Amino acid sequence: MANSLYQKHIISIPELSREELELIVETAGQLKKEPRPELIKNKVVASCFFEPSTRTRLSFETAIQRIGGDVIGFDNGGNTSLAKKGETLSDSVQVISSYVDAFVMRHPQEGAARLASEFSNGVPVINAGDGANQHPTQTLLDLYTIAETQSRLDNLNVAFVGDLKYGRTVHSLTQALAKFNNIRFFFVAPEALAMPDYLCEELDEAGIQYSLHTDMESVIPELDILYMTRVQKERFDESEYAHIKSAYILTAALLEGARENLKVLHPLPRVDEITTDVDVTPHAYYFQQAENGVYARQALLALVLNETL
């Protein structure tokens, strides 16, 4: 297929087609098997993180260098002169984009990536997270990991557990998987952290099966993918948090009735929601998932910066 990702802004998952998602997943798999260290040789990529990040920033910068690109940028935008001097985001983007071939950006403000794409002078902007809005490259590595472990992206039973209300990774991955066939979702959360109504309405309109649960153990035997998330302590008082947290802790014992092919994923960092005894089960795949971020981001950068590979 033609590479429709060439020079495209990567702002949100709904703007990517199934075919584009499949192309990224396929390319990531190829690059994992056969490294291509000169794919973006002589290209310069800005890595601009206006809020602190560890995994996403290091993963992106590793990906850039592994396929031959050069990286410039910063990892804490609040400490840069452009922030201290009060420069607007649009002005910063116009200046930085004149130096580079692609612009990777994380920003605490929802909608910042889209704003950046309007002022980047045609330089493709890749959203590395904009507030609680979207985190599309996390979704790409999640999709690649699911395809790698299940050998398919159709015909899957997928559960999301924990903070489904505020978790941008959950929202984006749900929207991505909804583009595939015969997906069934299990949303496991306390009522206070249930999946947002707008996403459930999107699934209803598309005729996609889903069910709401407050108990994790009962759904595990039906699953191909169990996607755990962290319940954020700051959203509850102490007693309420303790109750909710204890209800959604995955242990090795809970996985005894799971399908052989079940993989446990987590966007990390984990706190208490997956016990360390799960790490040594054949179901644990969250550290490999994090590693796959490098391959998914290599694939995305290569496709955005090359008309053909």
UniProtKB/Swiss-Prot annotation:
GO terms for biological process: 'de novo' pyrimidine nucleobase biosynthetic process; 'de novo' UMP biosynthetic process; amino acid metabolic process. L-aspartate binds at residues 85, 168, 230. The keyword Iron does not apply. Gene3D superfamilies: Aspartate/ornithine carbamoyltransferase. It catalyses: carbamoyl phosphate + L-aspartate = N-carbamoyl-L-aspartate + phosphate + H(+). InterPro entries: Asp/Orn_carbamoyltranf_P-bd (IPR006132), Asp/Orn_carbamoylTrfase (IPR006130), Asp/Orn_carbamoylTrfase_sf (IPR036901), Asp_carbamoyltransf (IPR002082), Asp_carbamoyltransf_Asp/Orn-bd (IPR006131). Its EC number is 2.1.3.2. Catalyzes the condensation of carbamoyl phosphate and aspartate to form carbamoyl aspartate and inorganic phosphate, the committed step in the de novo pyrimidine nucleotide biosynthesis pathway. This is Aspartate carbamoyltransferase catalytic subunit. It comes from Vibrio campbellii (strain ATCC BAA-1116). The gene is pyrB.
